[in-house]
């Protein structure tokens, strides 16, 4: 499907994955510029930006996942941010990373694939913190995925 047809069909996200982009992302960047030149206003996920992985399959699947969830994550985080502000929250807006740790809402919008398994990670971190607060009692935490 050409770029104009994609725009007419209402495509909102595009994943760009070229086989050697991990070594040189010049062509992926050129495709991004071309998409913008033709008027594509949606989300573009470049495999060279999403993952520096040299393995094509892993880089491609991660980029496709990123492209698939990016619009949804952006809409969700913007709605959540607005609602929290309306409720008077003026602290830091943070999201749990899949690999532990946290990221800002803006980072999560740019790299939503890094949040995919954040629920189980947050559960494990929460159980560990509870154990520490209870003087390191022996604890068993079950996390269902």
Predicted regions and their residues:
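Nucleotide/phosphate-binding catalytic cleft detector across ATP-hydrolyzing
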Residues: 4-138
